[in-house]
């Protein structure tokens, strides 16, 4: 009985944590000129574009989740990158989550992806296009060793390094988040051409995909950009600190209460949902 009660409690907690946010009730982009509003982890978007799900250069995964919306700059970046990759003969780019029709907070899985300027891209480039069944239930390839200290040599391919480099060299890209072990391998692969590495930032998880973030568009006056990454290639002490064990007594930070929405985002919710 106790086990059953605990199981039911866990299910209720899980269900509550995955309850739909108000943003998920907005099923179509909000009309208007494209405006990314607020910060990447606390914002929204007006006038989002829909990424076409049919393309000869890329494929969109989990279309049933309807997370293929973003600022026109993001849509153009995806089209630009995937065309470059295709022209080089690397394979098909696999597109994961972008944002919801009006951006905003997800019910789980992402803290950012709220202003239409973020996209997840799988770090695999299949030569054969995936079936619809594969796209709906994609199988990620974990490129990082079990101990988290390096990539798996048999899984790492030069095309993956080139994919990340191509994305980082795009003028609209401000950051790319990957696992520290992947960043470490990129540092080893880069040779003397290293300027692009500054944009590639180590982050938790991200073992099978890269998270690409664009800068705020010039005409999105309420968009909040992050500071630029520190100068340099980021391959030194900062990167190595990710592989050091936590200091004794270190505890996980408590989950923070989400900050208030930017006024324009709250007004958008008030008009379209609440």
UniProtKB/Swiss-Prot annotation:
GO biological process: peptidoglycan metabolic process; proteolysis
Name of the gene encoding the protein in the UniProt record: mepA
Species lineage: Bacteria, Pseudomonadati, Pseudomonadota, Gammaproteobacteria, Enterobacterales
The protein, known as: Penicillin-insensitive murein endopeptidase
Leader peptide range in chain numbering: 1-19
Compartments in which it is found: Periplasm
Pfam families registered for this protein in UniProt: Peptidase_M74
GO cellular component terms listed in the entry, alphabetical order: outer membrane-bounded periplasmic space
Source organism of this protein record: Citrobacter koseri (strain ATCC BAA-895 / CDC 4225-83 / SGSC4696)
Renumbered residue ranges of the record's region Disordered: 225-274
EC primary class: hydrolase
UniProt keyword terms in alphabetical order: Disulfide bond, Hydrolase, Metal-binding, Metalloprotease, Periplasm, Protease, Signal, Zinc
């Amino acid at each position: 009985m106790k086990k059953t009660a605990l199981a039911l409690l866990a299910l209720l907690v899980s269900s509550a944590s995955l309850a739909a946010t108000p943003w998920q009730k907005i099923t179509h982009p909000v009309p208007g000129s494209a405006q990314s509003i607020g910060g990447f982890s606390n914002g929204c978007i007006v006038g989002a574009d829909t990424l076409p799900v049919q393309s000869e250069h890329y494929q969109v995964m989990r279309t049933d989740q309807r997370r293929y919306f973003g600022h026109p700059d993001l849509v153009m970046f995806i089209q630009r990158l995937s065309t470059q990759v295709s022209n080089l003969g690397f394979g098909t780019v696999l597109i994961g989550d972008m944002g919801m029709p009006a951006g905003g907070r997800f019910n789980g899985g992402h803290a950012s992806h709220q202003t239409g300027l973020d996209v997840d891209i799988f770090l695999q480039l299949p030569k054969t296009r995936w079936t619809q069944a594969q796209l709906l239930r994609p199988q990620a390839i974990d490129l990082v060793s079990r101990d988290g200290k390096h990539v798996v040599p048999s899984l790492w391919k030069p095309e993956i390094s080139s994919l990340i480099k191509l994305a980082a060299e795009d003028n609209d890209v401000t950051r790319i988040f990957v696992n520290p072990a992947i960043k470490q391998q990129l540092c080893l692969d880069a040779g003397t051409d290293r300027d692009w590495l500054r944009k590639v930032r180590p982050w938790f998880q991200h073992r099978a995909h890269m998270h690409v973030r664009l800068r705020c568009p010039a005409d999105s006056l309420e968009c909040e950009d992050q500071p630029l990454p520190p100068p340099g290639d980021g391959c030194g002490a900062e990167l190595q600190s990710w592989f050091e064990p936590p200091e004794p007594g270190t505890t996980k930070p408590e989950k923070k209460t989400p900050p208030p929405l930017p006024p324009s985002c709250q007004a958008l919710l008030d008009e379209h949902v609440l």
